[in-house]
Amino acid sequence: MKKLSVLIGTVAALAMPFTANAQSFSGNANGSAGEANLEQSINVTCDVTFDGTVTSSTTVAISSPDIAPGDFSCLFVVPQGTWSAATVSGDATKIDITMGANTVANDPCYGTVRGDWDNSAKVLTITNKTLPPIDPNGATCTIHSATISIPNLNLS
């Protein structure tokens, strides 16, 4: 009888719904702006702006990314590839950003980096992350620091 009670208790526990630990975007990424310090052949600090649409609860399609002069050399740095953002399962303080840039050295980098998200301040911070070169013989790009305000995006 004791084994039957344990078995029934186990079955009842397994039948209970599990709480999903999925993170979810809402709002949009329109009006996002900040600056990024990027290094490949030289170190530059550029202004970054973009808009974006939440395309699913876990993805933001970033549109109209723009890299503008903070430093004069930023005139030669342009966005590369399709940019997007994705939730990190189980962690509402992290966002994966897929992005790229063609650099001053004309050696583009593109990839995904993980940033820290402050949902109260609506700020994404990226520190000391690398983007791989598109050309296998190219040089990596290092994002020493980036701080981007995304005022209309929520992550819960």
Regions found by a protein language model. Give the residues of each.
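Gram-negative bacterial Sec-dependent N-terminal signal peptides
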Residues: M1-N21
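Compositionally biased, low-complexity repeat tracts
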Residues: S5, Q23, G27-N30, V77, ...
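Intrinsically disordered, low-complexity, compositionally biased regions/tails
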Residues: A13, G31, E35-L38, A85, ...
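N-terminal segment immediately downstream of the Sec signal-peptide cleavage site
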Residues: F18-P69, Q80, A139-S156
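Short linear motifs in intrinsically disordered/low-complexity regions
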Residues: A22, A29-G31, A92, N119-S120, ...
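Short, hydrophobic/proline-enriched secondary-structure or compact coil segments at domain edges
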Residues: A29-E35, I95-M99, T125-I126
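Predominantly extracellular/secreted and cell-surface proteins with exposed
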Residues: D47-A121
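A charged, solvent-exposed segment within the mature domains of Sec-exported extracytoplasmic proteins
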Residues: G111-S156
